[in-house]
């Protein structure tokens, strides 16, 4: 017997339709699509809920797969996750490529470049930390760096080779994942979700989680329908913290970290502008230039916490072009095609919120140790594209009942009151 809908799960209007799937994934960015594809590959039917899939941070992202370059002090747990994800990328990309026209994954290396003596010291200090963690970063002479990348400025102060840091084109990746999800449904009709577009897509916004018998059983939709599922995975980035029906006391402290990013066309006489991803420091400010297979480059990215939302900052565009030109002067001759700004979902420790939610004493999931039917996968900050294969594998393991203890530091509960101090998660049913 059901009771009235909990107000936190959105408007209590009667559902216009009900979609049923083994797994509901809330959020259609790269992470959500990757999780959905991995769940589908395990033989589960998947409903991917998003009213504008691929339009958020994933659309703007440069797609650097850079666990070595992205190492920061006191982020060893995150480094282990990034290295795990990096090791999964070849197989992940090959699986997508086998089902589609290609994922946009490239194993081109990364070149770290410093513009002045202070930048050189900063990069060498970082190299010491990288080496202490067993990571390969080799100094190059400026002459050798310019042999590899002839359009680098002769005035740069240093260069370091980072062969393990690669790249993927997130826009191509998203298109390939959509193609793979739809193709799997066509190949195995049993995976099709009735009422979903192409057998998997639910083009609506999730209003809130639905509960029954103390477990999460799906999500309500802003348009009035519902998605019922054995497991629901919350992967909608910044919107996750505002989702209705989250377990009582669960705090998902997500903050928007905006970034401006540019896309430019390289004239024929300058192609290739660079063949490696160039990550630079220019007077202490980071900038990168990522080459694409179509002859364009991506230059990014600022990092700002302001009120501009998705508006592009004029100062950010100026800074990016100025600093990129300091490293590769020919940037001045490129055609500016696109300026984009999006917000990345950051957390207080810059690490993701990833895993099941511990259950409160007396709740339906207390014996199992977690809230039944719910997985959180958000807060990936700068690393969403890189971490996608790891997040997908971790969620697939959780669906099968396996929790890898290595990833306990990323528990989505770590900024909340401990489960033992919380009351029963839900006393009302919402379906």
What are these regions (language model features)?
Residues 1-22, 41:
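Extreme N-terminal leader/targeting segments of oxidoreductases
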Residues 21-47:
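N-terminal Rossmann-like FAD-binding beta1-loop-alpha1 element of flavoenzymes
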Residues 24-26, 227-239, 392:
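Short hydrophobic core segments
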Residues 34-41, 51, 63-64, 101-105, ...:
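Active-site substrate-recognition segment that forms the wall
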Residues 64-148:
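Dinucleotide-binding Rossmann-like beta1-alpha1 core, especially the glycine-rich loop
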Residues 80-83, 113-122, 160-179, 311-315:
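Short beta-strand to alpha-helix junction loop
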Residues 160-223:
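Helical element adjacent to the flavin cofactor pocket in flavoenzyme catalytic cores
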Residues 330-431:
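C-terminal catalytic lobe of FAD-dependent flavoproteins
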């Amino acid at each position: 017997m059901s009771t009235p809908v909990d107000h936190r799960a959105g408007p209590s209007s009667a559902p216009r339709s009900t979609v049923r799937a083994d797994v509901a994934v809330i959020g259609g960015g790269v992470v959500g699509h990757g999780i959905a594809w991995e769940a589908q590959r395990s033989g589960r039917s998947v409903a991917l809920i998003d009213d504008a899939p691929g339009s958020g941070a994933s659309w703007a992202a440069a797609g650097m797969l850079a666990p070595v370059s992205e190492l920061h002090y006191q982020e060893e747990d995150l480094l282990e996750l990034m290295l795990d994800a990096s090791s999964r990328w070849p197989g992940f990309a090959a699986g997508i490529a086998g089902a589609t026209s290609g994922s946009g994954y490239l194993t081109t290396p990364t070149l770290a470049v410093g513009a002045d003596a202070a930048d050189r010291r900063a990069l060498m200090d970082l190299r010491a930390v990288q080496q202490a963690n067993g990571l390969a970063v080799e100094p190059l002479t400026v002459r050798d760096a310019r042999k590899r990348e002839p359009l680098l400025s002769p005035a740069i102060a240093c260069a370091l080779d980072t062969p393990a840091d690669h790249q993927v084109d997130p826009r191509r990746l998203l298109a390939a994942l959509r193609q793979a999800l739809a193709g799997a449904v066509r190949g195995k009709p049993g995976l099709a979700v009735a009422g979903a577009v192409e057998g998997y897509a639910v083009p609506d916004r999730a209003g809130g989680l639905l509960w029954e018998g103390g477990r999460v059983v799906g999500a309500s939709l802003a348009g009035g329908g519902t998605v019922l599922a054995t497991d629901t995975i919350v992967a909608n980035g910044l919107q996750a913290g505002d989702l209705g029906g989250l377990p009582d006391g669960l705090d998902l402290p997500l903050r928007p970290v905006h970034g401006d990013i540019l896309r430019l066309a390289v004239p024929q006489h300058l192609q290739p502008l660079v063949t490696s991803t160039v990550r630079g420091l220019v007077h202490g400010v980071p900038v990168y230039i990522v080459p694409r297979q179509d002859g364009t480059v991506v230059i990014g990215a600022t990092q700002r916490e302001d009120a501009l939302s998705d508006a592009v900052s004029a100062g950010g565009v100026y800074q990016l072009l100025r600093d990129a030109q300091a490293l590769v002067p020919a940037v001045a001759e490129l055609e500016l095609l696109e300026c984009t700004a999006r917000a990345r979902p950051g957390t207080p420790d810059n690490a993701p919120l990833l895993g099941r939610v511990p259950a409160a004493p007396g709740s339906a999931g207390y014996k199992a140790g977690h809230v039944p039917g719910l997985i959180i996968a958000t807060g990936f900050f700068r690393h969403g594209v890189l971490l996608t294969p790891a997040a997908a594998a971790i969620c697939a393991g959780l669906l099968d009942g396996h929790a890898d203890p290595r990833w306990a530091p990323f528990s989505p509960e770590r900024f909340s009151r401990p489960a033992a101090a919380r009351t029963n998660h839900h006393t009302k049913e919402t379906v």
